[in-house]
UniProtKB/Swiss-Prot annotation:
The gene is TUBB3. It comes from Triticum aestivum (Wheat). Keywords: Cytoplasm, Cytoskeleton, GTP-binding, Magnesium, Metal-binding, Microtubule, Nucleotide-binding. The lineage of its organism: Eukaryota, Viridiplantae, Streptophyta, Embryophyta, Tracheophyta. This is Tubulin beta-3 chain. Its cofactor is Mg(2+). Tubulin is the major constituent of microtubules, a cylinder consisting of laterally associated linear protofilaments composed of alpha- and beta-tubulin heterodimers. Microtubules grow by the addition of GTP-tubulin dimers to the microtubule end, where a stabilizing cap forms. Below the cap, tubulin dimers are in GDP-bound state, owing to GTPase activity of alpha-tubulin.
Length: 445
């Protein structure tokens, strides 16, 4: 079976992860003690993608939970599903990273990383055919960003041929939690560009907007935001866990979405998003789902796809529907909005259909798009980074942990290169291709 090993780090990662396991347990009919209480064999057929079966018929998540302070883990453990995790898989320090990337990556995190890797190895050895890792973390803090990227690079060394998928929460433009977010995020992106295979980019502000505008919540909590994220996470892997007419897995997703290795930062969306009270009044159709999932208001990161072009995209539908209708709708989207797709990748939308819808819905769809407009996010972080770095503000917190200013400069230029690459492919047309080859040859020469 194609197992996925789930890793969550830092406060944000652990809170998203906790919500994710609630959703997955719900879909597979696992109760809060880890016992199966479902009603369909399909729930059990491929349950070992995310669960180990332990003695006494208990199902234990393949999850590794790490943090540099015990607080979030304690509340997770006392939460509704706290008892289903394997106790040994909680790895935490006492010191905290204090929103400092250097602490997470070089000092505190480096002390804890070996015990995390031991747990990861143990879990990986339990797998029959490990497909890859999914990591939940934020890029604005210290642990999720610093220690998260450290773990990703270590796993990369040890399991070079396995997929590495991250769900990364970027700092938002308007909602800022800490002053040094731009530093932490830039240093993390520097790592993610090199070591991750696929990054799903999330951002609190866009999630808040969805909660206000679409879900009509007056006071959205982090719980509501994390619920949105976990719906998407579940959608990305539903094809691995339930039978479907058109399957997709992490590797197929990567092959279809990544035209150039560095450009692996995706926007994600989910449909249907309806406010909590009004779900029962909606009859869903494939055209409605399609329209909603391509809507820029549905994107879970603060970049507007109308400001760029899609290099590639993938749509994962769930529920009983005809594949013919799905294909027609996807073609329809591409034909009507052809200016928003690059013309030098002809059929650039992949679709997959899984027969089992999520709990409480008759059908749903998950959208993953590789759009050049994601550069807006990097650009925004980069501007904030430069503003502070020019004055060397807050740098002593990082150099004090043994970092060098050079690292900051490298991370900054790597991020700017990334933005430039996105821009280059946004402007490229099908008939210009030869020019680029010549330019590259000149550069090489």
């Amino acid at each position: 079976m194609r197992e996925i090993l789930h890793i969550q780090g830092g406060q944000c990662g652990n809170q998203i992860g906790a919500k994710f396991w609630e959703v997955i347990c719900d879909e597979h009919g696992i109760d809060q003690t880890g016992k199966y209480a479902g009603d369909s064999d399909l729930q059990l057929e491929r349950i070992n993608v995310y669960y180990n079966e332990a003695s006494g018929g208990r199902f234990v998540p393949r999850a590794v939970l790490m943090d540099l302070e015990p607080g979030t883990m304690d509340s997770l453990r006392s939460g509704p599903y706290g008892q289903i995790f394997r106790p040994d898989n909680f790895v935490f320090g006492q010191s905290g990273a204090g929103n400092n990337w250097a602490k997470g990556h070089y000092t505190e995190g480096a002390e804890l990383i070996d015990s995390v890797l031991d747990v990861v190895r143990k879990e990986a050895e339990n797998c029959d055919c490990l497909q890859g890792f999914q990591v939940c973390h934020s890029l604005g803090g210290g642990t999720g960003s610093g220690m998260g990227t450290l773990l990703i690079s270590k796993i990369r060394e040890e399991y070079p041929d396995r997929m590495m998928l991250t769900f990364s929460v970027f700092p938002s433009p308007k909602v800022s939690d800490t002053v040094v977010e731009p530093y932490n995020a830039t240093l993390s992106v520097h790592q993610l560009v090199e070591n991750a295979d696929e990054c799903m980019v999330l951002d609190n502000e866009a999630l808040y907007d969805i909660c206000f505008r679409t879900l009509k919540l007056a006071t959205p909590t982090f719980g509501d935001l994390n619920h949105l994220i976990s719906a998407t996470m579940s959608g990305v892997t539903c094809c691995l866990r339930f039978p479907g007419q058109l399957n997709s897995d992490l590797r197929k997703l990567a092959v279809n979405l990544i035209p150039f290795p560095r450009l692996h930062f995706f926007m994600v969306g989910f449909a249907p998003l309806t406010s909590r009270g009004s779900q029962q009044y909606r009859a869903l159709t494939v055209p409605e789902l399609t329209q909603q999932m391509w809507d820029s208001k549905n994107m879970m990161c603060a970049a507007d796809p109308r400001h760029g072009r899609y290099l590639t995209a993938s749509a994962m539908f769930r529920g009983k529907m005809s594949t013919k209708e799905v294909d027609e709708q996807m073609l329809n989207v591409q034909n009507k909005n052809s200016s928003y797709f690059v013309e030098w990748i002809p059929n650039n939308v992949k679709s997959s259909v899984c027969d089992i819808p999520p709990t409480g819905l008759s059908m749903s769809s998950t959208f993953v798009g590789n759009s050049t407009s994601i550069q807006e996010m990097f650009r925004r972080v980069s501007e904030q980074f430069t503003a502070m770095f020019r004055r060397k503000a807050f740098l002593h917190w990082y150099t004090g942990e043994g970092m060098d200013e050079m690292e900051f400069t490298e991370a900054e230029s790597n991020m700017n290169d990334l933005v430039a690459e996105y821009q280059q492919y946004q402007d490229a047309t099908a008939d210009e291709e030869e020019e680029y080859d010549e330019e590259e040859e000149e550069e090489a020469a």
